[in-house]
Amino acid sequence: MAGYLKLVCVSFQRQGFHTVGSRCKNRTGAEHLWLTRHLRDPFVKAAKVESYRCRSAFKLLEVNERHQILRPGLRVLDCGAAPGAWSQVAVQKVNAAGTDPSSPVGFVLGVDLLHIFPLEGATFLCPADVTDPRTSQRILEVLPGRRADVILSDMAPNATGFRDLDHDRLISLCLTLLSVTPDILQPGGTFLCKTWAGSQSRRLQRRLTEEFQNVRIIKPEASRKESSEVYFLATQYHGRKGTVKQ
């Protein structure tokens, strides 16, 4: 069993099963179903036990366990960082807090429109819009060497309820972030972004293929089965000809 799944199982056993009936009183049917599912979710339970800010931490833990994208000494830009779960994982894996004196110390910078509570080992720009050129300049000023080795994006637009529109807006966010990689991402670097499967996914995949040596699609175990959520993992950044700044 993979390490992150062992962690989930152990955490689930520690917390055990609890009735959810009392918490569901006076709620609509849809609210009742959502709350019941949420409280029974092993990743929600594990996040609470392991002090992660939300269950999404296990998505990044799985990706990293399988593909080793984070290691001590790397500089990480976490886009859409609130509430900070991915930054927590990144801080641990790149040794940004310097807890392992025998390993290189990395750096984690999180950016979000929403407020993020402080986290030891991480620097946050918030509220800040990562698609705003002024934010890009601030990012460069904060990053050591004005470069990131890894760009993470768990960004998502506010849902409208119209699936195709939400998909198009998320793809647009990913493409906008990709457009600033020549200024920010170190050659040979890694780009991980969330999207919702749909008609524009191939457009994003083509762009990534033009700029990275390897591109793969990942559906982490912690992604809900009914969700169209997938992640593009692109490694070995080389950019399009003439776009990468050395």
UniProtKB/Swiss-Prot annotation:
GO terms for molecular function: rRNA (uridine-2'-O-)-methyltransferase activity. The keyword Transit peptide applies. Its main location: mitochondrion. It holds the Pfam family FtsJ. One of its GO terms (cellular component) is mitochondrion. It catalyses: uridine(1369) in 16S rRNA + S-adenosyl-L-methionine = 2'-O-methyluridine(1369) in 16S rRNA + S-adenosyl-L-homocysteine + H(+). GO terms for biological process: mitochondrial large ribosomal subunit assembly; RNA methylation; rRNA 2'-O-methylation; rRNA methylation; rRNA processing. Its EC number is 2.1.1.-. Keywords: Disease variant, Methyltransferase, Mitochondrion, Primary mitochondrial disease, rRNA processing, S-adenosyl-L-methionine, Transferase, Transit peptide. Belongs to the class I-like SAM-binding methyltransferase superfamily. RNA methyltransferase RlmE family. It is linked to Mitochondrial DNA depletion syndrome 17: An autosomal recessive mitochondrial disorder characterized by childhood onset of rapidly progressive encephalopathy, stroke-like episodes, lactic acidosis, hypocitrullinemia, multiple defects of oxidative phosphorylation, mitochondrial complex I and IV deficiency, and reduced mtDNA copy number. This is rRNA methyltransferase 2, mitochondrial. The lineage of its organism: Eukaryota, Metazoa, Chordata, Craniata, Vertebrata.
